[in-house]
Amino acid sequence: SNPERQAYVAALAAERESGSAASSNPDPVLSLEVGRKRLRDAGGAFLDEGQVWTASLSQTFEWPERLRLRRAIADRQIEAAKLGLGRFEQALEAKAAVLAYRLSRAQVRAQACEEVAARFAGLRKALVGRDPSGPAPTIELRSVEAAEVVARRRAEEARLALQQALLEMNQLRGAPSLAPLTVKAPVLALKDAPKLEELLAAAQQGNFSYRMHVLESEQLSLQSDLARSDSVPGFTAGPYVSQDRVGGRETIVGLRFDIPLPVSGRSSAAERSANERRRQSKSAISAAWRDVEKDLGQTWLSYASKVDQLRMHKDDPAVRFSEAAKLAESHFRAGALSLQLFMDAQAGYLEAVDSALLIQEQAVEAGFRLRELSGVPFNPVASR
């Protein structure tokens, strides 16, 4: 139901239709000429007048080698359209997975901010009933109010991010923009990436950008061969019949044969131009492969780094800091903890949530980016 995917499917269908006609000769041409003829003698005296007409049927024939080259060029265009569709479907799947993760994590982030804001609101109400004598109670109250404002702002930002992710997800699904959607927050286990050497080997066939450069080079090579074959062009042949009814009836039946003469040098110029473009495309292939090696190496290192960071903690640091934030509240209300430590615990909880979710999101994106760059069916996320 995704409209962009339908556009790629339509483009592939169009290339297939064009390819089906690439290896066939043009349609025959029927020509008809009709006129009148007036016959006079040498002195200008009128002798006779009547109708004349000519009809011909002609067919242009291409040499088999030229038809083969045209079909091969069309096959490369079809393969390029298939690659485009496959790349889009792969990117669509990856984007849907990342958006689903982002949607669930935005819910977690919003809940954490609202939880902290509620704690500060409860503490603010408790501080209002204290004896306001001296500057310390007032400063403490204002500090708590400021922290509550910051927590509510972050909660609002998290809710906005949630709505933005929802809009993007509904666009991908082809659903109404504000259609409700709930995604359960998964407990993720990130897989180890394949070895970099394996990814690079697979990228020679699986990387879209590199494959497109290779296909373009192959297509230009075929076009160069096609331009070279212009020195032996196709020919047109067919029967014709003409009739003249002036001064009697004269009928002529014959065979017509036409062949272009390559005397202008256009075919050789086209061949030289195609050869230059082919050499240029080979240089572009080398540059494209260097880009693949660089992007794949950087993404592989980034993914491995993020996975190592997440595996440093056996449990979710956000959960551990959440428990510490709750414990800090109970101890502060009991008078066993200072206000500063209480506020530090709440701020640390929010920072831990943001950091953990950000690293997880970056790891998921890097994992799917590895799949996009290499073409390996690697799913970085495994639900526990």
State where each predicted segment sits.
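Small/polar, glycine/serine/threonine/aspartate-rich low-complexity segments that form flexible
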Residues: 31-66, 70, 182-195, 235-273, ...
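Short, charged, amphipathic alpha-helical segments
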Residues: 71-75, 138-147, 339-347
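Periplasmic alpha-helical coiled-coil/stalk elements that build and connect Gram-negative outer-membrane
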Residues: 85-206, 299-306, 349, 356, ...
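Alpha-helical hairpins and coiled-coil heptad-repeat segments
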Residues: 124-141, 324-342
